């Protein structure tokens, strides 16, 4: 019997919504990356985009373990000499929390063309509302041990 190889036309895409309220950032990122890659499906293939769409809401209420709020830094560079800008995760969580969640999740995807395509199926929102109600996303519950 030959091994089944999924074709891109055979992939069934489902929309998931994850509530990030009081969920540790790393645990959220691993679960979301698994859904984006499609590793939860029985016909997963590493060379085909079999993943689902993931909508993360309440990104501003995500939990950071340890002293990451003060010590962890987000770096960006303008491309000019002396253009390195650093911001603590605490400041970023107060102003633009979706950046922290996106960076954590996309960092767990493959660093190639397929990973970039999978990253486009990630939608992150700081508040509890999102514009994807028409897709009827199913709630995805992240089970975690008490903090």
Curated annotation (Swiss-Prot):
Alphabetic keyword roster: Ribonucleoprotein, Ribosomal protein
PROSITE patterns named among the record's database cross-references: RIBOSOMAL_L13 (PS00783)
A GO cellular-component term linked to this record: cytosolic large ribosomal subunit
A Pfam family hit: Ribosomal_L13
The keyword Ribonucleoprotein is annotated on this UniProt entry: yes
Biological processes per GO annotation: negative regulation of translation; translation
Gene3D superfamilies, per the entry: Ribosomal protein L13
Molecular-function annotations in GO: mRNA binding; structural constituent of ribosome
HAMAP family assigned: Ribosomal_uL13 (MF_01366)
Subunit structure: Part of the 50S ribosomal subunit.
Function: This protein is one of the early assembly proteins of the 50S ribosomal subunit, although it is not seen to bind rRNA by itself. It is important during the early stages of 50S assembly.
Protein family: Belongs to the universal ribosomal protein uL13 family.
Protein name per Swiss-Prot or TrEMBL: Large ribosomal subunit protein uL13
Record organism: Frankia casuarinae (strain DSM 45818 / CECT 9043 / HFP020203 / CcI3)
